């Protein structure tokens, strides 16, 4: 039976995301450093990801100013008590056709016995922005 190395199971993008997460865990930076890291990652994104990430950032900060901005697997994220609540993943990160706005298990987005924890974004209309703000407020309630 042929064996493969574990690294062959992951794409180059996935391996880079894991390396970024390891660097983030080592840094365990303050809220100010987290914001600077997040803004730097957004600035590195190609368009249209950058514009979308900037808008999502503004929405999250306005909806839940107590969340701590940071990076998570090299992407913008927002934490409460050190635990990631929500995140933005640029389409360019894994070379897919849509960006993702998602929630982690500590987000209070429960809705009955089944609910979405991630949303595909191809653009942001006013209704989408309002929905993201509503979801973020619910997530931290």
Model features per residue range: what roles?
Residues 1-141:
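Charge-dense, helix-prone N-terminal extensions
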């Amino acid at each position: 039976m042929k064996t493969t190395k574990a690294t062959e199971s992951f794409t180059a993008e996935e391996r880079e995301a894991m390396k970024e997460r390891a660097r983030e865990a080592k840094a365990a930076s303050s809220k100010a450093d987290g914001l600077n890291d997040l803004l730097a990652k957004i600035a590195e994104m190609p368009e249209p990801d950058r514009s979308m990430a900037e808008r999502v950032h503004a929405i999250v900060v306005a909806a839940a100013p107590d969340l701590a901005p940071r990076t998570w697997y090299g992407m913008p994220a927002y934490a409460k008590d050190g635990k990631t609540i929500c995140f933005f993943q640029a389409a360019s990160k894994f070379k897919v056709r849509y960006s993702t706005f998602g929630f982690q298990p500590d987000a209070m987005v429960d809705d009955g016995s089944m609910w979405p924890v991630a949303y595909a974004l191809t653009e942001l209309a006013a209704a989408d922005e309002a929905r993201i703000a509503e979801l973020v407020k619910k997530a931290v309630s």
